[in-house]
């Protein structure tokens, strides 16, 4: 069993908890196989892994050629499955993806040939389908999902109900924020690849949204966020913020991170007097440091360069 796997994949480095080669490894716990991490391997069958089905908890395949996934469904104790940058001669596995009763995390990423995912699961909490060509979530039936990552693909709306979803990573360009009505418990939103004419209409319907971060957005002030009354943490680092205009409309905002923006300085404490923490280059707040100290507002200046 294990000896055959060692020989087939040239796993010649043996220690107390790992059997490995330069690119792949098997992790042991109490002499039982619990994790497989394979990189750039040709895996013609999952039959080699079936003897460990009762103990195998985690699998990571990176840049592997996976010829036959039909036996994957027999790994019923699997909790974490990562298929990153892998090739699949038979793509039909994604038309009816196996249901693992114990699976908590599923990552299928960095393969633009994947256009569909048909899956049903009551156990998965985290799903990452970034860098694929999946266009919709109509066939993703995961009612207990708490985190969804969909960056660098073609998903422009949430067309499935995810009542427990709390964390979402999504491309903002052309995204329909009104579709987030399907995620009533969304608390953390991470936005990437914003458009030059980016709008946030519809996002105000996410009444429980507490955390928002944006990367490379076109916004020069805080007016686009003015309807997001529930926000407590806003991260706009490395954006185009030139002024604090609009910040007064965010009454519950506690933390503001804004390193590396073109804003030259803050000379008036009024817009941020309700904050608990501001992260900004020190030279931009020199005029108000005494006021910040008086109000007990912490300032983080690690971004000073």
For the regions a language model picked out, list residue spans one by one:
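Surface-exposed cap/linker segments adjacent to membranes
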Residues: 1-19
């Amino acid at each position: 069993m294990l000896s055959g796997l060692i020989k087939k994949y040239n796993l010649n480095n043996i220690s107390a908890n790992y059997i490995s080669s330069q690119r792949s490894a098997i992790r042991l716990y109490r002499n039982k196989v619990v994790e497989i991490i394979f990189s750039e391997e040709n895996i013609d069958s999952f039959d080699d892994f079936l003897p460990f089905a009762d103990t195998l908890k985690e699998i990571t395949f990176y840049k592997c050629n996976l010829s036959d996934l039909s036996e994957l469904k027999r790994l019923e104790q699997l909790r974490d499955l990562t298929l990153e940058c892998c090739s699949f001669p038979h793509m039909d596995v994604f038309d009816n993806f196996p249901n693992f009763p114990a699976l908590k995390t599923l990552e299928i990423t960095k393969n633009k040939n994947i256009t569909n995912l048909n899956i049903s699961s009551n156990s998965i909490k985290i799903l990452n389908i970034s860098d694929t060509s999946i266009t919709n979530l109509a066939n993703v039936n995961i009612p207990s999902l708490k985190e969804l990552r969909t960056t660098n693909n073609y998903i422009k709306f949430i067309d499935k109900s995810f009542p427990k979803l709390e964390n979402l990573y999504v491309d903002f360009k052309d995204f329909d924020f009104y579709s987030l009505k399907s995620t009533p418990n969304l608390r953390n939103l991470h936005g990437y690849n914003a458009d030059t004419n980016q709008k946030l209409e519809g996002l105000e319907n996410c009444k429980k949204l507490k955390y928002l971060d944006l990367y490379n957005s076109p916004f020069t002030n805080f007016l686009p966020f003015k309807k997001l009354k529930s926000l407590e943490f806003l991260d706009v680092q490395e954006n185009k913020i030139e002024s604090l205009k609009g910040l007064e409309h965010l009454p519950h905002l506690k933390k503001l991170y804004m390193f590396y923006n073109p804003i030259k300085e803050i000379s008036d404490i009024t817009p941020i007097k309700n904050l608990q923490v501001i992260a900004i280059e020190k030279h931009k707040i020199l005029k108000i440091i005494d006021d910040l100290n008086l109000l007990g507002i912490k300032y983080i200046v690690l971004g000073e360069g």
